[in-house]
């Protein structure tokens, strides 16, 4: 019984540590156009590491962007809430569908990805205007 408790404790600690590392990750880009390219790639449901490589952006865990990569986030506006909500929603909920997209020849997965992306857009824009107005 003690062995199971130790294994369970190590598993929980590993999950907590990996969650902290994921939350601390920041993507920094050399220009606004590469930042936009990165965001478009993510909104299509691709993995963050793939989008960083394709757009020329860098993932960092230090909390700030290195020199030459000053664009770590969008400018502060009401649209930022929507953009980041959509990016997070699409990448977490629609990512698995996107990887299936390449294997599907019938087009059914394309429809599912479109619906998933639209659902994320609806969820994210529904209450964001109220939240931005109250801040």
UniProtKB/Swiss-Prot annotation:
Gene Ontology CC annotations of this record: extracellular region
Chain's role: Thionins are small plant proteins which are toxic to animal cells. They seem to exert their toxic effect at the level of the cell membrane. Their precise function is not known.
InterPro entries xref list: Thionin, Thionin-like_sf
Subcellular localization(s) per the UniProt record: Secreted
Full protein name: Probable thionin-2.3
Signal peptide from the UniProt entry: 1-24
GO molecular function terms attached to this record: toxin activity
Keyword list, A-Z: Disulfide bond, Plant defense, Secreted, Signal, Toxin
First-listed, main subcellular location of the protein, grouped into a coarse class: secreted
Propiece residues: 72-135
SUPFAM superfamilies per UniProt: Crambin-like (SSF57429)
Transmembrane spans: none
Species the sequence originates in: Arabidopsis thaliana
Lineage: Eukaryota, Viridiplantae, Streptophyta, Embryophyta, Tracheophyta
Record family assignment: Belongs to the plant thionin (TC 1.C.44) family.
Disulfide bonds, paired cysteine numbers: 28-65, 29-57, 41-51
GO biological processes: defense response
């Amino acid at each position: 019984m003690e062995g199971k408790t130790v294994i369970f404790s190590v598993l929980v600690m590993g999950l907590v540590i990996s969650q902290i590392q994921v939350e601390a990750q920041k993507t920094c880009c050399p220009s606004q156009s590469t930042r936009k390219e990165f965001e478009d790639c993510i909104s299509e449901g691709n993995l963050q590491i793939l989008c960083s490589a394709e757009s020329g952006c860098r993932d960092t865990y230090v909390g700030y962007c290195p020199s030459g990569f000053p664009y770590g986030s969008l400018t502060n506006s009401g649209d930022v809430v929507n953009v980041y909500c959509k990016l997070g929603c699409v990448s977490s909920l629609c990512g698995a569908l996107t990887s299936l997209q390449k294997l599907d020849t019938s087009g059914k997965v394309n429809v599912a990805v479109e619906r998933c992306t639209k659902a994320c857009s609806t969820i994210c824009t529904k209450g964001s205007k109220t939240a931005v107005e109250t801040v």
